[in-house]
From Swiss-Prot:
Record: residues binding ATP: K31, E118, N119, L120, D131, D325
Lineage of the species this protein comes from: Eukaryota, Fungi, Dikarya, Ascomycota, Saccharomycotina
Descriptive protein name: Inositol polyphosphate multikinase
Residues holding substrate: P127, N128, I129, L130, D131, I132, K133, L134, G135
Organism of origin: Saccharomyces cerevisiae (strain ATCC 204508 / S288c)
Effect on the protein of changing K133A: Abolishes catalytic activity, but preserves its nonkinase transcription regulation functions
Length: 355
């Protein structure tokens, strides 16, 4: 790998902060790091890494909904591996992807820190993305008075306050019937692309009465059959039910976190996978406990063997739902589940049950 040319702005994004980068293969993303988000990722992943896969009773640990955290990258420096043994094993498995990450191109004298995360879009051919921000309360105790007042107004005047969630943005394949439903202020057409970006103004303009129509719009893909669209909605309903159960067991507080919906809009990939979707994302890295029996396979890892990052184009999912954005999240032992998040998930469940 070269250095500068291997980092580019993340192409597909429905909302969020500017400055998110990806590597040349699109396997990883590099997201500007906030101290609280970094600590949350480390704490959750260290706690849950041994039970990342769904347990026998069907529950899923919180980390199974989150992008895999791989470490920290400083501008002008190589990846800084975690000292935690559980994470170190994952870091070592990714050596082929990270050993040559010499630096992120520096654009200012002040060095930045980046979270190194699994790219949730990796493996999708034509991803369609929906970002749903959870919660009625949109600020934490550290927010300034000005931000508190501003976020209160946003909550009070949008579905955040009434329903516990708000559509933050979408990036979907162009569809004439969708464009006919949208005012020009709500979307941008990308030049030389078959995508449109639906901005936050659209989400803020939705009401209790029409927000379900906005979610229907997300699934209104001109390249997929009605049967495939119906399958997607039912699969996301199952995910929401499972995620709801996860959050009832978690003692955390998450402000302005989002659910990221992704589905495949390329019918050829649907055919390649025989329309078979997976409820949960595959582990980013296979974690085989019998490593000692597979020492002879070490040389194959660099070529994408079963113990390296998977070829998700042929083995991955046709859709996924993930929890993202933890700059204002923390573990809160003894305080019970997060009602601020639970209320929004309950409303989403009601909507998807009616599809």
């Amino acid at each position: 790998m070269d250095t500068v040319n291997n980092y580019r702005v993340l192409e597909h994004k429905a909302a969020g902060h500017d400055g998110t980068l990806t590597d040349g293969d699109g396997l990883l993303i590099f997201k500007p790091a906030f101290p609280q988000e970094l600590e949350f990722y480390k704490a959750i992943q260290v706690r849950d890494v041994s039970r990342r896969k769904s347990s026998a009773d069907g529950d899923a640990p919180l980390c199974s909904w989150m992008p895999t955290y791989l470490g920290v990258l400083n501008e002008g420096a190589k990846i800084e591996q975690s000292g935690d043994a559980a994470l170190l094993k994952i870091d070592e498995r990714l050596s082929d992807s990270t050993d040559n990450l010499d630096s992120i191109p520096v654009k200012s004298e002040k060095s930045k820190q980046y979270l190194v995360l699994e790219n949730l879009l990796y493996g999708f051919s034509k991803p369609n993305i929906l970002d749903i921000k959870l919660g009625k309360t949109l600020y934490d105790s550290k927010a300034s008075l000005e931000k508190r007042e501003r976020m209160k107004r946003v909550s009070e005047t949008t579905t955040s306050g009434s329903l516990g969630f708000r559509i933050c943005g979408m990036k979907i394949q162009k569809n004439p019937s969708v464009l006919n439903q949208l005012s020009l202020e709500y979307y941008e057409e990308e030049a030389d692309s078959d995508y449109i970006f639906i901005n936050k103004l659209y989400g803020r303009s939705r009401t209790d009465q029409n927000v379900s129509d906005a979610i229907e719009l997300y699934f209104n893909n001109p390249h997929l059959s009605d049967a495939r669209k119906h399958q997607l909605k039912k699969t996301f309903l199952k995910r929401l039910q499972l995620f709801y159960n996860t959050m009832l067991e978690e003692e955390v507080r998450m402000i302005s976190s989002s659910l990221l919906f992704i589905y495949e809009g390329d019918p050829e990939r649907w055919e390649l996978l025989n329309d078979v979707d997976k409820l949960m994302r595959d582990d980013f890295i296979d974690d085989d406990d019998d490593d000692d029996d597979n020492d002879d396979d070490d040389d194959d890892d660099a070529e994408g063997s079963s113990e390296g990052p998977k070829d998700k184009k042929t083995t991955g999912s046709l859709s996924s739902m993930s929890l993202i954005d933890f700059a204002h999240s923390e573990i809160t032992p003894g305080k019970g589940y997060d009602e601020n998040v639970i209320e929004g998930v309950e409303t989403l469940l009601d909507i998807f049950m009616k599809f």
